[in-house]
Amino acid sequence: MATVQIRKSTPVLFVDAIEPSLPFWQQRLGLKRTVEVPDGERLGFALLSNGTIEVMYQTVASLKQDSAAHAANFTGDRSFLFVEVDDIGALAAALDGCEIVMPRRETFYGSTEIGYREPGGHFVTFAQFRR
């Protein structure tokens, strides 16, 4: 059996509109928009990256146009992302005023975590591990 080499994993977050989610990643966390695909007057797809992590956004309308089979299976569920950071305090300061869905906590597996709901409705847990 051949060995499969997985190179990376990038989440695709489906939203009604991409634009409200962009400041969360760009202005607050420093990611850059590296790819964008317009869909009429708005964005239909966007890829954000800082060289280490990537997050893709696609509108539900664009998904329906792109792949009816995938769209038929989309139920509107929201994703949960887990992102490791070097400084949880700096992260919390950068996201001051954003909706916290999991208050800062210490875990049994050695991390300090805090969870947010980004403007598209998806959940993002940020974690700093003790080194």
Over which residues does each language-model region extend?
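Vicinal oxygen chelate
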Residues: M1-V12, K32-V83, A92-R117, Q128-R131
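Short, conserved charged micro-motifs
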Residues: P20, I88-A92
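Conserved active-site tyrosine of GNAT-family acetyltransferases
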Residues: S21-Q26, L95, E118-G121
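Short glycine-/small-residue motifs
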Residues: F123-F126
